[in-house]
């Protein structure tokens, strides 16, 4: 039986567990090590005034970060932002600094702008090789595919991406994979539903299907409830495509929010909204709770006045990151 969640009454709903076809990740197995993707907010080093990654760990309880974005440097060649080399630059230094501080990183491919590898690489095997170059460069244990624009809206490119990820999953046993994509308040729309169905059809089993419940394009009065509603509808899609239980489905779902003011002038994800998302994630043991981005996790002022460098809300530094640090599945 599926219960409808109400933000004000989390404890009223209890889901029963059942076996399913989707492989249960470390989130559900009780392994002692927390998956990297579970609580790893995004940081982007390409603009603004980014917070030093190791400094984020030192200032908060967070252990892991998701560094963004790897794009195409032309043809099918991966590079940070499509321009910076994989090795010998600031991005490799950032990864090394996080690991030296006792943490780890996931690397995110794609994002909202730039040339995407899924489009530039003309076959699934070539795209898998591009992903593998990045995995091998850093010995990665976790990757995120932030699939947007043509990668998301073109059926042929979507299928190429999931086929490439299936190759990566076979070649790297145990690797964590998140597929992150846009959603409506009513849940994934046609492209998102097709993405899930295509992945299930070829046996791809991501650690997390992560929705981005913001930039809805219409006024939303309650961003926490809108986010929860989107997740509940995503659960339906996973049940339909993978034929699994509700419990297993939730353990393979993620929320990637946006802290403070979003790209929409009438949207704000407040600290209180994010606290409710945290409570929901804890209730249903979601695979992932994250946000865009650590760069913005501070009040505006001084050198940090652009929307890329601050949240636009009244907050303490790292207020959203501190909440993610509380999440342990």
What annotation goes with each model-predicted range?
Residues 1-28:
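Secretory targeting and sorting signals
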Residues 15-19, 48, 288:
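Hydrophobic alpha-helical elements and their junctions with loops/disorder across both membrane
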Residues 23, 83, 291, 297-299:
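Intrinsic disorder/low-complexity detector
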Residues 32-211, 215-244, 248-274, 300-327:
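Chitinase-like catalytic core of GlcNAc-active glycosidases
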Residues 249, 282-284, 293-294:
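C-terminal "post-core" interaction segments
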Residues 254-257, 288-293:
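Conserved active-site loop/cleft motifs that coordinate metal ions or position small ligands
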Residues 270-287:
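Short, low-complexity, polybasic intrinsically disordered segments
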